[in-house]
Amino acid sequence: TATPTNPFNEQLVSGGSSSGSAVSVSRNYCIGSIGSDTGGSVRIPAAWNNLVGLKTTHSLIDLTGTLKLCPSFDTLGPICKNVDDTYFLFHGMKKRKFQKLKKYKVSDFKFLIIKNMFFDSIDSEINDSFNSVIEKIIKNGAKVEYKSVSEIDNAVEISKIVFPAEAYGMWQHEIEKSPEKMFAPIKERFRSGQHILAHDYVFSLQQLFEFRMSFLKKIMSFDAILAPTSPIKPPRITQLIDDHKLFTEKNLLALRNTRIANSLNLCALTLPTQTNFSGLMLM
């Protein structure tokens, strides 16, 4: 089936590989759906359809019966219109006994905003929306700190080796059996893992584990990290089809912020804001 268009503007894309899940909720076909998130494919469709999307902690939800992309990063999570429905569906996926969602005051929390990377090349409307939300949070008593964290940059660089190595390793036979059937920019992304050596992959994965531990030590005093879910709004479909270079550029930029949570093995939640396509991500 074809990728669905965006319900809020049919000239725009609706998200990543779980876009069908998000559009189904946005168009009221269901109250909730399930998506997969390896680098942002629950959170980007949720944000670009003004929905709530939860990227769960790696290995928390059983992946039996799913098609793997990158086993070290693959997760499943719910997409719904509000937090209550998301919480309910998450409990069903986890097979937990449902417990009533606790209510907290914003003033109970201490948030971190990481200055490096998350705001590079950000759309002005997305940036304004994020700053507006932060102003409201501070006004309501929350503590907010800004700081740079080097592990963010390190983890993203390392993931450029680990992601393609695993993805090509999982799908090489299907791709090379009929390469002409695959969208060229995506095929080349997969093939970028073709020549990564096993010892480089193992070393990079070990480095990533070390960066994760170091990162967690630095953020332990905070309740959550706040960031824009994506630095850009959904692009026009025709632009991406006609310009493969632009497709790759927009695809990588759209997923840049969300992939950080996957690389560092964080759970992450995107919430809709008052601005269309401008999700607020908590990690």
Predicted segments with their positions:
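Short glycine/serine-rich loop segments
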Residues: 1-90, 262-274, 279-283
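Short, surface-exposed loop/helix-turn segments at secondary-structure junctions
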Residues: 4, 202-203, 234-255
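Conserved acidic residues
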Residues: 31, 223-225
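Gly/Ser-rich, acidic/histidine-flanked active-site/gating loops
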Residues: 75, 92-161, 182-183, 195
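Short helix-loop capping/hinge segments that flank enzyme active sites or metal/cofactor-binding pockets
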Residues: 108-110, 162-216, 228, 267-281
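Short glycine-rich anion-binding loops that position phosphate/pyrophosphate groups of nucleotides
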Residues: 117, 230-233
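Acyltransferase
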Residues: 124-148, 172-177, 201, 205-222
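Small-aliphatic-rich amphipathic alpha-helix that forms the alpha element of a beta-alpha
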Residues: 216, 248-272
